A protein has these predicted regions:
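Aromatic, loop-rich ligand-recognition surfaces of beta-strand-rich domains
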Residues: 1-50, 56-95
Length: 95
């Protein structure tokens, strides 16, 4: 699964905070992902950021990721969901 963040113009970014959705619902269960990666768009290609801190998937808090600064128009989270569960993002902050 993936979700994208588009800027109106090229922007330098160096970190993100992701608050993962995790709760039980009558329609299905939502869990933090098993894993995730962050990509940025360079030209027509997606490249993984050079992470400077661990990728975390903790529930009930922001999961902070520092990375080598990049200038881009788009970011993309690619998440590997836990088997049998849905996933989601409550909030995604970009700095």
């Amino acid at each position: 699964e993936n979700v994208c963040y588009r800027f109106s113009q090229p922007t330098e970014v160096k970190s993100v905070d992701v608050y993962w959705l995790d709760f039980d619902h009558y329609d299905g269960n939502f869990r933090t992902p098993a894993s995730w990666k962050l990509y940025y768009k360079q030209g027509n290609q997606w490249k993984e950021v050079e992470a400077q801190s661990p990728y975390t998937t903790d529930k009930d808090r922001y999961n902070h990721l520092d990375f080598h600064p990049v200038k881009t128009t788009d970011l993309m989270i690619v998440a590997q969901l836990q088997e049998g569960a849905s996933g989601g993002v409550i909030e995604w902050k970009v700095e």
